[in-house]
Structures are given as C-alpha cells and as structure tokens.
Regions:
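AlphaC helix of the eukaryotic protein kinase fold
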Residues: 41-63
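Conserved short submotifs of the Hanks-type protein kinase catalytic core
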Residues: 79-93, 97
Length: 293
C-alpha cells in the first residue's frame, strides 16, 4: 500500500531501509523542512516489548545532541502506523565510499575521529549504539560523518534487510556496552585504511596497505582489543586527532622542503614578448624615418 502522508509529514520518495523498517524522504508541511520518516515494521510495532524499547530510545536520544549523530525529532503514530521522524542526511554510506578500496589515510583518520567524538558525547549520558558498521555511517558532501540508527541495536536482527552487527570474522572482546562501540570504530578504521574488514591474523593496516601510515597501527590494534582496548571514546578520539595532526605537520614539512618547480615555458614567453616589442619599435622607427626624412 502506498503511503502519502503520516501526520504532518508528506511522503516524497523511498530512501532505503533501516533497522526499524522502510525509510522515506518526507516534508514537514508545517515548517517546510525535509526529514526522514521511518515506518516501523509491523513485526516490531506489534510487539509491546519493542514498543517500550522504542519509547526508551526516543527519551534517551533527547539527551544527545551532536553534529555527528543523526537527530531524532519525533516518534508518532498515524492510522495504526508507528513511525519515527529524524534528520534527513544527504550523502553516501561509508560502506559505499570505501567500495573495497582504501581511503586516503588522512581522510580515514578524520572520519574515525568524528565518529569517536560523537560516541564520547553519547557514552557520557549512557547512550550506546551497539551496532556501528560502515553501513550505519553516512558521509555528507562536505565530509561530515553522521551516525545513523543510534541506540537501535536491539532491532538490528528483528527486521529482514536491516544492518546487522557482524564485523567480518572479528568480534568485540565481550559484550560490554560502550566497548562494543569502540571496537567497531577500530573495525571501521581498519576497513577505511585497507579497503576490507579485518579478520584474525590480518595484522596491522600498514601490513595490508603500505600507504597506510604506521603511526595509526597501534591505535587500530588497541581498538580491536589488544592491550585491553580503549576505556573511553574520548581517549580514542584524542589519539586519532594527535596522529592526524602529526601527519599534517609532516606533510607541511615535506611541502616546504620540496624545491620550487620552475616552469621552462615562462622564459620562452618572456623572450618572445621582448622580440615582439623590438619588432614593433623597429617598425615604428622605420615609419617615422620614411615619413619625415
């Protein structure tokens, strides 16, 4: 059945499938803004326990406001359909951007830093994602990472086609809330640096992709559980930013040390200009001489 509107939201077009059900691009007819409307799947909406979980999620999301987390606006119901309204984000999923190929290391570190900083704010109020993958990260045209489906891990296997929690053959060491999120950042960072998800025995990113800077290897290894993993997302974010700054300084030093490139065409153009000028002066002199002498 085609859905034309839900409450004050006019449905414009399908936009994909999320952890809860089908997602649509819609317009808020009261204020004119574009939003994302998720129609909650019947198997979730008809389950009293799941409904209660959604209400808890909606209340918890109100405590988190971060530019790298998709904002939830409303959880409503219209004509028996349960729906969720959230910020509409234009961009591509990180999974699509990677496409089986390594990203520029500096870009990968920047995106991972954004994700970790968002998690730091969320974890500070005990709000955990629980199922972060490259599919749940949308990157805007301006390069901002936006975490989607935040707090919906409980539904990730409830709806066919929804993003799951599997991360290759790797698994987080234990199932302790925030630690799962930090482990997932390590998985995503490895995938961005190498073009593929880590598997046991894969080694560090620089061993898979020689263009990946070795300075990032200890961070990825620790995030994936070695040496006890990271205790907080804030610590992970700080270390990522530090490595990013180091790479920036190194690049600036490299650019400053590079000899200036001299264009050989400029002298030729300069000589040609002088020749043309000389010919013009000679012609003018000849004209003046034969005119007045």
């Amino acid at each position: 059945m085609t859905i034309e509107a839900l409450g004050q939201y006019k449905i414009l077009e399908p936009a994909g499938t999320g952890a809860l059900g089908d997602v649509y691009r819609a317009r808020d007819t009261r204020v004119g803004t574009t939003v994302a409307v998720t129609v909650v799947a019947d198997e979730i909406a008809s389950n009293p326990e799941h409904r209660e979980q959604l209400l808890r999620y909606a209340r918890a999301s109100g405590a988190v406001s971060h530019p790298n987390i998709v904002t939830l606006y409303e959880l409503g119901e219209d004509a028996g359909r349960l729906f969720m309204v959230s910020e509409f984000v234009q961009g591509q999923t990180l999974k699509t951007i990677i496409g089986g190929r390594p990203l520029n290391p500096r870009r990968a570190i920047d995106l991972a830093s954004q994700i970790a900083e968002a998690l730091a704010d969320a974890h500070a109020v005990d709000f955990v994602h629980g199922a972060i993958t490259a599919d749940t990260i949308v990157v805007t045209p301006k390069g901002r990472a936006k975490i989607t489906d935040f707090g919906l891990a409980a539904f990730s296997t409830s709806f066919p086609g929804a993003a799951g929690t599997a991360q290759g053959s790797h698994r987080a060491p234990g199932d302790s809330s925030a630690q799962v999120d930090l482990f997932s950042v390590g998985v995503i960072l490895f995938e961005m640096l190498t073009g593929r998800a880590p598997v046991p025995g894969a080694g560090v990113p620089s061993a898979v992709n020689r263009s990946s800077p070795r300075e990032i290897d200890p961070i990825v290894a620790r995030a994936l559980g070695k040496n006890g993993g990271y205790e907080t997302a804030a610590t992970l974010a700080a270390e990522l930013r530090a490595v990013g700054a180091l790479l920036d300084v190194r690049q600036e030093a490299h650019d400053a040390a590079a000899p200036p490139v001299m264009s050989r065409s400029k002298p030729k153009r300069s000589y040609a200009a002088w020749i043309v000028l000389a010919l013009i002066l000679a012609a003018a002199t000849a004209w003046w001489y034969f005119r007045f002498v």
